[in-house]
Each structure stands twice: as C-alpha cells, then as structure tokens.
C-alpha cells in the first residue's frame, strides 16, 4: 500500500493504533465546546444525553414559553391537551440525528458506548456502539455507516456500476475512508489498481483503530490511499485512465458539497475511459427530489453515454432509502439495468475469498431501477 498525504498537517498514521495527540483522548474530545467523557456540555446545556436548553427542556418535559409543562400543551383558549407518553420521549443515552436536509424528523439510536468523539479539520467525527446496528459512524451529526445495517448501501454502490461493465481493472473511490467500499471492491479478481481519496485523515485513523479488518485492506498492493481533496484529485487525473469511479460521499453540505456540482462531474467524465462508469450517492426520493433533479440535470449535460437513477433500502438512513446516480461516458454501450458482470451470492466465494454477499444479487440490481410513479415522472421529465 502507498499512502500519500496532501493535507496541510501531513499526518494520518499514528503509532500503535493511538489517536494523534491533537486533542483526541480516550475516545473523547475536549474542544472549546466542552465535549468531555462522552458528554456534551455546550452553551445550550446538553449534558448526559439530556437537553436542558434555555427554552426549558428538562428530564423529558418541556417548559416553553408557550406553556408546555409536565406533558401538557396549554392553548390560548385555556384548554389543555395531554401529551401521551411524553415522559419517555426524551431519554439519556440516545443519539438523535437532526439535519436541515430532513427537517421535521429525526432518527434515534440507543448508545451502548461512545467509542470516539472528535473534531477534524473538516467536520465533527463520532463513533459509538449502538444497541441495534453495532458500530455507528457519524459526520457532523449525520449517520454515515453502521456496521450491521450499512451493507445494502455499500454493496449497491460498488456492484451496481462494476456489475455493469466487463472486466473492471482501474477504479477510483472518492471518500470511503473507513474501508467498507474497498472491502466490497476486492471481490473482483480483474481489478489491478484502486485509488482511494479521502479528505479527512481522522476518518482513516478511526478505521485503523476501530475497524482493523477493513483498514488492513489499505495494505493491499493494488491499493493507493491518498489523503486529500477528491475533487482536486479527479481534476488532475490522467484523461481516460479509470474504468469506474465510485463517489462514496456524505451529503451535499460541508466538505462534500463540490462532489455534487457540474465541474466535478466534468472532471469525472474526463478521467473515465470511453464507456467508463461512475456511481455516486444521490440522496432520498422522499426528501430530496429538488437535489436529485439538479444532479440529473448536471449529469445529462456531461455524460453522453447513459444516465440512470437507482435506489435501495438502508434502515439507518433518512426515510430508510438512498439513491444512486449511475452514468457512463460515450463509447461502448452500458446497460446499467441488466448486469453483464454480476457478482452474485452463488459465485462470490468462487471469485474471491470474502464472505458471501448479504444484500446484492442480480434481481435486486435490476429492481433498483424501478421507481415509484411520482419519482419516475419527475426524474424522466
């Protein structure tokens, strides 16, 4: 394995599996915002998983100025509405995912143990052990991957594109610094070269510390790990070099924002060979049709082969689903909806030494492109 650092601090690998001494200690983060011992003591008063804001949330009750007290809502007309079960609605020891990308709703998981909490140069990074899904990685408060529930996302983002072309040899992964995507990609015996570009060295450090079975694949002789900006890397890549590019990014905010815009897709198309393919994470049809339509518009202007949208189910993502954009450059025809190189459960152990697939098969591959009527009409318009 070759490791290339393009970050300004130049530091990624730490000795003996220890987190670098930049403030991360014993799985805690002692920032100016007051994270200590797995608790958060911000100015707004979050402590021990309980929210004690200035608006008066305390011990599972709400005492707002609008009259929420002891599980009731007092209206201006003097009537009170009983809030059933309000005493159990706020509990310590739970992680709740809030974001402007999915307003008005949240997803919660019970935290068994906080494993790591820190702030990198780019984002807040947290890893905890959940009661249901094993280890859970979050970036800026949004769930990125769960050890026992994220395999549908990973298997599909790899096998939808690679199953659609014969004999992939040179592949680029943007993001994916934990290593789940690389793990799936190594099923293909034809692959000769894999470049991984991860912008956040702390994500890689977390992988080495808490997912050693994944980080071990960084040492595969076919793999080059680059620590730097994925958009800049693609822009500088040799034209026509890659057979496939997989963009395993977070949501289109923060450091991943550039990975959803037209200049990035233009650089991707240039870096792909004729008939090369790209697959990128493309949000949820239930919440983000406005984002999806913009991504599709950008891709149709750039990619002269085919442009397709697929989706699948992931239990720990907002609305329980996630989408993918699959595009090809002009050249040999690519029919994403009918895999020519499927790596099904029956053949997995023949083609690699890895455990059988848990989610992907040829039927699910084909079904991923069947969209609900409302989504189909908007995407095809």
Curated annotation (Swiss-Prot):
This is Putrescine N-methyltransferase 3. It catalyses: putrescine + S-adenosyl-L-methionine = N-methylputrescine + S-adenosyl-L-homocysteine + H(+). Residues 92-329 form the PABS domain. HAMAP family: Spermidine_synth. One of its GO terms (cellular component) is cytosol. Involved in the biosynthesis of pyridine alkaloid natural products, leading mainly to the production of anabasine, anatabine, nicotine and nornicotine, effective deterrents against herbivores with antiparasitic and pesticide properties (neurotoxins); nornicotine serves as the precursor in the synthesis of the carcinogen compound N'-nitrosonornicotine (NNN). Methyltransferase that mediates the conversion of putrescine to N-methylputrescine. Promotes leaves ripening. GO terms for molecular function: putrescine N-methyltransferase activity; spermidine synthase activity. The lineage of its organism: Eukaryota, Viridiplantae, Streptophyta, Embryophyta, Tracheophyta. Pathway: Alkaloid biosynthesis; nicotine biosynthesis. GO terms for biological process: alkaloid metabolic process; methylation; nicotine biosynthetic process; putrescine biosynthetic process; response to jasmonic acid; spermidine biosynthetic process. S-adenosyl-L-methionine binds at residues 123, 198, 229-230, 317. It comes from the Eukaryota. Predominantly expressed in roots. The active site is at residue 248. Its EC number is 2.1.1.53. Residues 21-81 are annotated as: Disordered. Belongs to the class I-like SAM-binding methyltransferase superfamily. Putrescine methyltransferase family. The gene is PMT3. Induction: Accumulates upon the removal of flower heads and young leaves. Triggered by jasmonic acid (MeJA). It comes from Nicotiana tabacum (Common tobacco).
């Amino acid at each position: 394995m070759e490791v290339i650092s393009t970050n300004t601090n130049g530091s990624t690998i730490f000795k003996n599996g220890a987190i670098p001494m930049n403030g991360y200690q014993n799985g805690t983060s002692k920032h100016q915002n007051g994270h200590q011992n797995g608790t958060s003591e911000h100015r707004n008063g979050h402590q021990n998983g309980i929210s004690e804001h200035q608006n008066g949330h305390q011990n599972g009750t709400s005492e707002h100025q609008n009259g929420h007290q002891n599980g009731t809502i007092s209206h201006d007309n003097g009537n009170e509405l009983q809030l059933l079960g309000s005493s159990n609605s706020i509990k310590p020891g739970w992680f709740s995912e809030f974001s402007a990308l999915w307003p008005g709703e949240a997803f919660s998981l019970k935290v068994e143990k906080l494993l790591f909490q820190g702030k990198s140069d780019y984002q807040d990074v947290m890893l905890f052990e959940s009661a249901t899904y094993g280890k859970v990685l979050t970036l800026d408060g949004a769930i990125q991957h769960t050890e026992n529930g994220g395999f549908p996302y990973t298997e599909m983002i790899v096998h939808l594109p690679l199953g659609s072309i014969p004999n992939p040899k040179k592949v680029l992964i943007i993001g994916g610094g934990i290593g789940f995507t690389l793990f799936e990609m190594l099923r293909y015996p034809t692959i000769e070269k894999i470049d991984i570009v991860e912008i956040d060295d702390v994500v890689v450090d977390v992988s080495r510390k808490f997912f050693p079975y994944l980080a071990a694949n960084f040492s595969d002789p076919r793999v080059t790990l680059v620590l730097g900006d994925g958009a800049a890397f693609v822009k500088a890549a040799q034209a026509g070099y890659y057979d496939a590019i997989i963009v395993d990014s977070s949501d289109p905010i923060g450091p991943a924002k550039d990975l959803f815009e037209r200049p990035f897709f233009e650089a991707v198309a240039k870096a792909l060979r004729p008939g090369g393919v790209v697959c990128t994470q493309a949000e949820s049809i239930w919440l983000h049709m406005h984002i999806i339509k913009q991504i599709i518009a950008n891709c149709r202007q750039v990619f002269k082969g085919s442009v397709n949208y697929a989706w699948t189910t992931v239990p720990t993502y907002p609305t329980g689903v996630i989408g993918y954009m699959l595009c090809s450059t002009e050249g040999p025809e690519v029919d994403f909806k009918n895999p020519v190189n499927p790596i099904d459960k029956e053949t997995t152990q023949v083609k690699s030494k890895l455990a059988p697939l848990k989610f992907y098969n040829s039927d699910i591959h084909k079904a991923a492109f069947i969209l609900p009527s409302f989504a189909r009409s908007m995407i095809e318009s």
